[in-house]
Amino acid sequence: MQRLVEIERFDSEESVEVTLRPSAWNEYIGQEQIKKNLGVFIEASKKRAEALDHVLFYGPPGLGKTTLALIIANEMNANIKVTAAPMIEKSGDLAAILTNLEEGDVLFIDEIHRLSPAVEEILYSSMEDFRIDIIIGSGPAAQTLKIDLPRFTLIGATTRAGMLSNPLRDRFGMNFRMQFYSPEELSKIISQASNKLNKKIADEACSEIAKRSRGTPRIALRLLRRVRDFADVANEKDILHSRAQYALDELGINSYGFDEMDIKLLNLLVGANGRAMGLSTIAAALSEDEGTVEDVLEPYLIANGYLERTAKGRKATPSTYKILNVTMPALDDGGLF
């Protein structure tokens, strides 16, 4: 079952996201420092009539990495080729993409940390020297064919920057860490999207949805669409605060943006009586794999101070005890089980 607060994109959401996605800097809300720096680099590249240096965006899913890549291409007046690492299975697949690029084009590779080592090696020379070496034949008769490439910009996006090899990471001239969004930024995003959906929404309703959206635009837009469903069924022309509040409560998203799975995890940690819990123990108790716990459940809770990762495991924070209305243990022996 898919969670409404899931940060990964649902298969059915791609076309909707395209409709609601901003296409220019003045429409893009949030990530102000990244926008400011990119604006300088883009302007400098345009003045020199050069391709923009390679860019790496990293951070949790749903924060706008793909959108920024599309805006960069738009600002550079460049064509963009969008792909994902799992679709590039062999070095020949990447070579075919690279040899079809034109001068100044942008190549966006999502989930770039999932490239195989063989494919990654092709990127090294193409990023640094704008050249690829293709081996024709095998054995003693094998020959290397050098193919020059037009100067292009590679934009990589990853949720696991630590999984990138050092040689690949070092070839990106710009590295940007995407931050979670403030409730105020999300409110603006929700209002903007509501206009595109031709549905008026009260400011208070925007704020209500925003505070339950876990700092993530993808979740905010998903919740907006579900709240709109409730309003439409109730034959309400506008989305009012009371309707947004009712809809989100019915959907099981509380005022902290927690759903049932979050509450289960936090109750599990609180039940440890101040001791740290190992990742494998948590995963087994929740019937989830460790990767899901680490990459999907934990980031928002850690970023907002509800969960602490220590050398000995995971622990609930004072904020967690407070919102769950549980008294903190007087002693903490720091044990692990």
From Swiss-Prot:
Molecular function as annotated in GO: ATP binding; ATP hydrolysis activity; four-way junction DNA binding; four-way junction helicase activity
Record: residues binding Mg(2+): 66
A Gene Ontology term for the protein's cellular component: Holliday junction resolvase complex
Keyword Cytoplasm assigned: yes
Region (Head domain (RuvB-H)): 255-337
InterPro entries, per the entry: AAA+_ATPase, AAA_lid_4, DNA_helicase_Holl-junc_RuvB, P-loop_NTPase, RuvB-like_N, RuvB_C, WH-like_DNA-bd_sf, WH_DNA-bd_sf
Protein name (Swiss-Prot/TrEMBL): Holliday junction branch migration complex subunit RuvB
Protein's organism: Sulfurimonas denitrificans (strain ATCC 33889 / DSM 1251)
Upper taxonomic lineage: Bacteria, Pseudomonadati, Campylobacterota, Epsilonproteobacteria, Campylobacterales
